C-alpha cells in the first residue's frame, strides 16, 4: 500500500531528501553532493530508498523543489512526480517544524530569502544577496579556502572584537538601546595583519548579523517577533552566539528547528497533501 510522500530539495550540487509517512512523521532526511543536479537527485533518491528499505511501490508521490528542479521534467523512476514552489515549501516546512502559524521564515542558502507566514498565507517578502555564497566567496579571497569545515575550525580560535568596531570602542557609555558590546561597524576594526582565525570569525559574524538585521527590518509594522531559521547556515556554531545577542537587543525570537537544514524538502512533501485536498 502506498504511504510515503518523498520531498526533494534539488540544489545545483547538493540535494536534500526526506520522506513523510501517512502519520506525518519525517523519515531519515539525508543530503547528497554531486557535480550536477541530475546526478545529485538520482543519487540521493536511490540512496534514500536503499538506506530506508523503501520499495518503489511504497512511494505515493515525489515532490521536487529548489533551483535544480527546473532541470527535471520527467517522472522520477516512473513515479508520479510534481513540483512545489520553493517559497511555499520553505513556509510549509518551517511551519511544520516550528509549530508556529505566524512567523518570518529565513532561508539561509547561497543568498537569503524571507517568507512571511500568517496562518494559511505564505508569501515571499524579499531577501538579501548575502548568505553561504558570500561566506564562501570572501573566504576564497581572504582565507584562500572555501572549505566550510576549515573556516569553522579557524573561527573557533578567532576574536570578533579584533575585526568589528563595537559601541564600546567609540563611546564611553552605552547608547540608547545599544549596549557597549553591540556592533557599531562590521570589519571596521580589522588590521592589515589580522590573523586568519580572526578573519574567519569576522566573516561568519558579518554574514549572520547581516541576515539577522535584514530579518528584523523586514518584520517592522507586521507585529511578528518569531523568526524561523532554515538552510545550511543554521549549522554554523556561531548561530548560537549571534542570534541570541540580537534577540536580547531587539526583543525578538530566532528559532532553529530540529531539521532546519531539510525544511524545504519537508515542505515540498507537505505541499502534495495541500495540493490534493
Identify what each model region corresponds to.
Residues 30-34, 45-46, 50-86, 119-124:
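Short beta-strand-loop/turn "lid" adjacent to the catalytic site in phosphate-handling enzymes
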Residues 1, 72-106, 111-121, 266-274:
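Conserved phosphate-binding catalytic cores of ATP/NTP-utilizing and phosphoryl-transfer enzymes
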Residues 120-175:
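Glycine-rich phosphate-binding loop plus the immediately following alpha-helix
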Residues 2-43, 122:
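Short glycine-rich, Thr/Ser-proximal phosphate-binding strand/loop in the N-terminal lobe
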Residues 92-97, 135-139, 254-277:
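Glycine-rich phosphate-binding/hydrolytic loop that grips phosphoryl groups
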Residues 176-226:
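Adenine-nucleotide phosphate-binding core of ATP-dependent small-molecule kinases
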Residues 81-87, 244-266:
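Conserved phosphate-binding/catalytic loops in two-lobed NTP-binding clefts
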Residues 64-70, 217-246, 261:
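Glycine-rich phosphate-binding loops at beta-strand->alpha-helix junctions
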Amino acid at each position: 500500500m502506498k504511504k510515503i510522500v518523498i520531498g526533494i530539495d534539488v540544489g545545483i550540487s547538493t540535494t536534500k531528501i526526506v520522506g513523510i509517512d501517512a502519520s506525518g512523521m519525517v523519515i531519515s532526511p539525508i543530503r547528497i553532493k554531486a557535480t550536477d543536479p541530475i546526478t545529485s537527485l538520482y543519487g540521493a533518491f536511490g540512496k534514500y530508498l536503499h538506506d530506508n528499505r523503501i520499495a518503489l511501490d511504497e512511494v505515493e508521490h515525489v515532490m521536487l523543489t529548489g533551483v535544480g528542479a527546473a532541470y527535471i521534467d520527467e517522472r522520477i523512476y516512473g513515479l508520479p512526480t510534481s513540483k512545489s514552489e520553493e517559497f511555499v515549501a520553505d513556509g510549509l516546512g518551517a511551519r511544520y517544524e516550528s509549530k508556529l502559524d505566524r512567523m518570518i521564515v529565513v532561508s539561509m542558502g547561497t543568498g537569503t530569502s524571507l517568507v512571511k507566514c500568517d496562518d494559511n498565507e505564505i508569501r515571499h517578502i524579499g531577501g538579501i544577496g548575502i548568505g553561504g555564497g558570500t561566506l564562501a566567496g570572501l573566504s576564497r579571497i581572504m582565507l584562500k579556502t572555501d572549505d566550510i569545515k576549515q573556516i569553522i575550525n579557524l573561527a573557533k580560535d578567532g576574536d570578533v572584537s579584533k575585526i568589528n568596531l563595537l559601541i564600546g570602542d567609540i563611546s564611553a557609555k552605552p547608547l540608547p538601546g545599544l549596549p557597549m558590546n553591540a556592533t557599531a561597524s562590521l570589519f571596521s576594526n580589522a588590521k592589515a595583519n589580522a590573523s586568519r582565525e580572526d578573519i574567519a570569525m569576522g566573516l561568519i559574524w558579518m554574514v549572520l548579523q547581516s541576515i539577522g538585521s535584514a530579518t528584523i527590518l523586514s518584520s517592522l509594522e507586521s507585529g511578528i517577533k518569531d523568526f524561523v531559521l532554515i538552510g545550511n547556515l543554521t549549522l554554523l556554531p556561531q548561530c548560537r552566539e549571534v542570534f541570541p545577542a540580537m534577540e536580547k537587543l531587539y526583543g525578538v525570537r530566532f528559532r532553529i528547528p530540529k531539521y532546519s537544514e531539510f525544511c524545504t524538502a519537508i515542505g515540498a512533501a507537505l505541499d502534495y497533501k495541500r495540493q490534493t485536498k
